[in-house]
Amino acid sequence: IPLYRSMKKTSAMFQDIVSSGPFSSVAPKAQMNIGRAWINKARGFKISQNERHKNYHMAVEAFKKAADKYHDRPGVASEGLFAAGAAYQQQSLDAEYDQGVIHKAIDSFSDYIALYPNKERVSGARERIQAMKVEQARGNLKIARYYENRGKWAAANIYYNEVKDLAPGTEYAETALQKIAELQPRLDVEKESGAQPK
């Protein structure tokens, strides 16, 4: 999107196009370009993490609007849904402890797969979902270790179980299975003693 140096001005220009002729032949592309401008702004230098998250949010909203408003144009609708998932995925790279963003990305890609099963980007969407699940597993493994180091065996066990379910067959799942086996005797002792689980 080469027009203005300011992506905010660029997105405003594309918004003017969409507002002037919402169902014109150029409006769908302009709506998608609004999202792309916000993505470019999020990738810019000298902005805070909070500002970057707001920019990704604006991009997602623009892409979703394209998918919803132009749902009768399959190319635009599918591209908007895929782009929304990709924007959520980019945002999730900044938000290590915010698993909600990853869930939204996975949901967007899952919707894309369900609604457009014959599109060529379906395999890419599946790969992205798998990569994000592995990333979720890595994050949950860190949380499980945190609880284990503080003697909160039941909480650690919950997160280790999530790890093995999210990314079966990975090194994270193997580690989680090993830790679950190590924690089981401690959990059994707590259960037998009637103590409140830690």
Sequence positions of predicted segments:
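Acidic, polar-rich low-complexity tracts and alpha-helical solenoid repeat scaffolds
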Residues: I1-K198
